[in-house]
C-alpha cells in the first residue's frame, strides 16, 4: 500500500514539474474568441496553464516595454506587434492571425437603419457615441478613420465618449451610457448573445485591422508557447475565430 501511495506521489510531482505556464496578452477584441481557443487547446494539454490578459494593445505594449513579461502578445493591429519586434523583444517577425471587423452597435435598432452612411441623418437622436480610445486602441483608430472618411468627425466630436479598450463601448451601450458604439464585431456577433443589435461597417472606410502576434523573448525556452502558436494557425482555431466574426488570413 505504501508503495502504491509513493507511486502516486511520484507521478503527481512528475506531472507538476513538467507542467508549463504561459502569460499571454490578447487585445480585447479577441478576448472571447481566444478564451475558447485556449480551452480547446488545453484539452490536449491538461497539466498546463495559459493565463490570458486582456486590454488595449497600446497600453500593454508600454507595460511590456517597461518590463512586464508576456510570452505571447496578440495585438489588435500590426503596429504594436511590429514595435515589439523593432524593440528586439521577439523571437520572430509579427504574423497576422485574424482580420478585425468594425460594427455599429446600439440598443435602438432605428439608429442602425441605413448603416454608417446614414448616421448624419440621425445626429440629433444621438447624444453619446462611444469609441475605444485611439491613443491606445487600434479599433479606436479605425473608428476615428470611419468618422473622418464620412465627414462625421466634426458633427459628433462633442458627443464622443471614449473607452480605454474596445470592450468598453459595448458596456457603454449596454448600460445606456451611450446611444451608439463603433465596436469590434467579434464582441457583439450573435454567438455573444448581445443585448443590442449590430450592423457591419464597410471595410473601405478604415485601414484593415490586421491583428498580429509575436512570440516574445520570454518564451525562448517554453515549448508550450510554440505549440499554442501552431494551434492558432490550425483549422480548428480558425473556425472558432470565424464563429465570433473575424476574417482569417
Say what each PLM segment does.
Residues 4-15:
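Sec-dependent N-terminal signal peptides
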Residues 14-19, 69:
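Intrinsically disordered, low-complexity peptide-like regions
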Residues 20-44, 53, 58, 65-66, ...:
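Exported/periplasmic ABC-transporter solute-binding proteins
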Residues 50:
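Hydrophobic anchor at the start of a short beta-strand
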Residues 71-74:
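Periplasmic-binding protein-like
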Amino acid at each position: 500500500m505504501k508503495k502504491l501511495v509513493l507511486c502516486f506521489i511520484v507521478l503527481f510531482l512528475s506531472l507538476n514539474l513538467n507542467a508549463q505556464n504561459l502569460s499571454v496578452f490578447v487585445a480585447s477584441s479577441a478576448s472571447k474568441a481566444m478564451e475558447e481557443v485556449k480551452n480547446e487547446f488545453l484539452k490536449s494539454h491538461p497539466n498546463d496553464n495559459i493565463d490570458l490578459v486582456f486590454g488595449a494593445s497600446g497600453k500593454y505594449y508600454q507595460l511590456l516595454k517597461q518590463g512586464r513579461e508576456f510570452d505571447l502578445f496578440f495585438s489588435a493591429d500590426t503596429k504594436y506587434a511590429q514595435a515589439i519586434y523593432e524593440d528586439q523583444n521577439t523571437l520572430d517577425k509579427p504574423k497576422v492571425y485574424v482580420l478585425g471587423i468594425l460594427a455599429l452597435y446600439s440598443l435602438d435598432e432605428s439608429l442602425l437603419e441605413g448603416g454608417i452612411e446614414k448616421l448624419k441623418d440621425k445626429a440629433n437622436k444621438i447624444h453619446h457615441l462611444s469609441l475605444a480610445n485611439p491613443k491606445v486602441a487600434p479599433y479606436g483608430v479605425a473608428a476615428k478613420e470611419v468618422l473622418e472618411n464620412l465627414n462625421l468627425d466634426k458633427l459628433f466630436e462633442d458627443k464622443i465618449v471614449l473607452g480605454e479598450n474596445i470592450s468598453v463601448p459595448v458596456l457603454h451601450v449596454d448600460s445606456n451610457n451611450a446611444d451608439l458604439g463603433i465596436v469590434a464585431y467579434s464582441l457583439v456577433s450573435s454567438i455573444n448573445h448581445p443585448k443590442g443589435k449590430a450592423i457591419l461597417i464597410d471595410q473601405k472606410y478604415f485601414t484593415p485591422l490586421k491583428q498580429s502576434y509575436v512570440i516574445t523573448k520570454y518564451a525562448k525556452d517554453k515549448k508550450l508557447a510554440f505549440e499554442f502558436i501552431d494551434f492558432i494557425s490550425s483549422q480548428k482555431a480558425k473556425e472558432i475565430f470565424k464563429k465570433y466574426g473575424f476574417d482569417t488570413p
